Amino acid sequence: MSKRILVIEDTENNRRILNDLLTNAGFEVLEAVDGEKGVAMAAEQRPDLILMDIQLPIVDGYEATRRIKANPELRHIPIIAVTSYALSGDDAKAFAAGCDGYFAKPFSPRVILAKVREFLT
C-alpha cells in the first residue's frame, strides 16, 4: 500500500507540481487549499505525512500545524513546512509551531523527495 501525503497548498500551480512529483514517485496524494480544510482532511484521512504551506487563507500553516499537533490522534504525523518565506528565522517559527521539517520555495524536486522518503522510512 502506498503512503498517503496530504499537500496543503493554496496555489494551484504549486499543488499540481507537488502532486505530479509525489504521484510519479509512487505516493498517494491528497490535497487541501486552505489550513482549515487541511486540518479537517488530516483528521478524516490520516495521511502518513503532510506538506504544509505556511501562507494559507482562512487558517495559516502555523495555526493549522498547531491544531494538528494538538490532536493526540494526529500528532504523530510528520509535517514539513513548504514556504516562500525564505527569511531568517522562518524555519524556527515553523519548528516552534510543531513542524518536523522545512523547505523554502523554490525547492529542488530531488531534495524534497529525499526528505519525504526520510520521514516515511
Task: List PLM regions with ranges.
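Charged docking surfaces used in two-component/phosphorelay signaling
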Residues: 16-24
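Short hydrophobic/Thr-rich beta-strand motif most characteristic of the beta2 strand and flanking loop
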Residues: 26-33, 41
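C-terminal output helix
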Residues: 107-116
